[in-house]
Amino acid sequence: MKKIITIAAILVLIGTACRREADYMPYIGENGKLAYSTYTEQFDYLWKVLSTGYVFWDVDTTDWDAAYSRYYPKLQELDKKYEQIGYVPTDELKELYTALVGGMIDHHMSFSVRNLHPAPDDQVNYVTIRPYELEIPTRDYYFESSGEESYAIQIFLQDIESHYTVEVHEECTDYAPELGMTIRYHYILFKLPDGRKVPYLWQSLAGITPVMLQNGVGAQLLDHYFRAIMETPREQLAGIILDNRCNRGGYQDDLDYLIGSYLNEKTEIMKTRYKEGPGRYEYSVWTPYYIFPNTRYHRDITAENIPYVVLCDLNSVSMGEIEPMTIKAVLPTAHTIGERTHGGTGPLQPANCIDLNYGGPLGDINTGHYVYTSTFEAQISGKVWEGIGYTPDEIVLRKDYNGNLLPQLDAAFRYIQEH
């Protein structure tokens, strides 16, 4: 993952008399080493953690000071309950923390708290709140699939020859050690009725960069996809399709291939910033993030007016949605189709990098808490899209077709043939 460097800082410190001040913390990495013995101490500490380390305070509408005033007394009641009966049901703790953080906009966030004194019949002794699990089902185009989404699209692609003429269809699974996950790939070279070709790529995660470095089966498949784009004569190349439906995210370096392969010069694609200090609004400056022309693959699809269609849906998350957003923002022939995406656009760093700044994942559930939250705030096309997601150029909803994946792909081919 690329390192992002800033050269200046913006400092804004805000305090109020309606709640206890967030104590200065030397760096947020220390937060994982603190201890507490009561529910109020636990709450007080976690409130300070998010006051310091949450990166979206400039756009999140949660009134964090009012939340302290409202919920601190409720945690005092839990302490009294423990003193009276010797335990606190985990469901009661979950209800309070869901009300506290459930409406936050960070769609990467996972907020876990251990119940210090669970009831004897509690099945678990901790609660986990993920704001996106509460927000996503409220969208009017939400479609509840009967199975895991990435499997659904793989089954669909395995039967693609029954819908379209296919000249090449390669699929494989490769392991990306940097992600600690396996990635499933499908490369298809479609043939249109007029004989022209459309290279297509679907991957379950954004892992082109680490897989290319390994030079295994995944790298071979990816090379075939990019070679088809680079080497097919213009009169035979109808367009390009990148399918990011059900793509759960991964490496931002993949943009070096997915955008850089089509650039002639260094290009800014977004800006990022992070929490530089303990103050709630103590950010670094917005730092441009540039993509350079790819030295391995290159074709000027803008000059040749080659359509570049990117499919995305509600299950396009993190890099899975940043890719269609930035491709559309940078490349004039790009066109996006599908659904408004998940809304988790804040880049992340591993927990072992947390001491480099004041935001991101921290803690250990075995010692009381674990908070997984975005390290960086991203601004694309002048806007922070966290908790909102990206709305594509052309809306085609799976819900309108009982979950069928084909109409979105049909729309991609229709656009390519019309342009």
Residue ranges and their predicted role:
Residues 1-25:
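Bacterial Sec-dependent N-terminal signal peptides
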Residues 199-203, 239-243, 269-271, 307-312, ...:
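Structural recognition of the beta-strand scaffold that forms the well-ordered cores
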Residues 331-344:
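Short, well-structured beta-strand/strand-turn elements
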Residues 17-270, 355-357:
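Flexible, low-complexity junctional segments that flank or bridge functional domains
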Residues 205-209, 246-252, 268-269, 276-278, ...:
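Solvent-exposed loop/turn segments at secondary-structure junctions
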Residues 320-332:
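Non-catalytic, well-ordered alpha-helical segments in soluble enzyme domains
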Residues 381-419:
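Low-complexity, Gly/Ser/Thr/Pro-rich intrinsically disordered linker/tail segments
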Residues 249-307, 349, 355, 368, ...:
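Gly/Ser/Thr-rich loop/hinge elements
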